[in-house]
Amino acid sequence: MRLILWLPVLVVVLLMVTEGPAPAQGAPDVASTFRNIPNSLKEFGNNLKDTFESIPEATRKLMTSFAERLKNFRIPLL
């Protein structure tokens, strides 16, 4: 019974061992990383600007929908 339970574990361990080491990752090019930082910051700034510019319009739409709901809201009398 123990052999039957240990057999799948043994198979998995053997597969892991025969797979070998993982391939090494290439070293990153530091110079290109530093060259891309200004572009990344500019893109981030533009995205942030677009997001903040859309906030007033989204707030206006939300408040308008609340005002419409309140206009049609009636308190039931007891």
Curated annotation (Swiss-Prot):
One of its GO terms (biological process) is triglyceride metabolic process. It is found in: Secreted. One of its GO terms (cellular component) is very-low-density lipoprotein particle. GO terms for molecular function: fatty acid binding; phospholipase inhibitor activity. Residues 1-26 form the signal peptide. The keyword Transferase does not apply. Keywords: Lipid transport, Secreted, Signal, Transport, VLDL. It comes from the Eukaryota. InterPro entries: ApoC-I. Belongs to the apolipoprotein C1 family. Inhibitor of lipoprotein binding to the low density lipoprotein (LDL) receptor, LDL receptor-related protein, and very low density lipoprotein (VLDL) receptor. Associates with high density lipoproteins (HDL) and the triacylglycerol-rich lipoproteins in the plasma and makes up about 10% of the protein of the VLDL and 2% of that of HDL. Appears to interfere directly with fatty acid uptake and is also the major plasma inhibitor of cholesteryl ester transfer protein (CETP). Binds free fatty acids and reduces their intracellular esterification. This is Apolipoprotein C-I. The lineage of its organism: Eukaryota, Metazoa, Chordata, Craniata, Vertebrata.
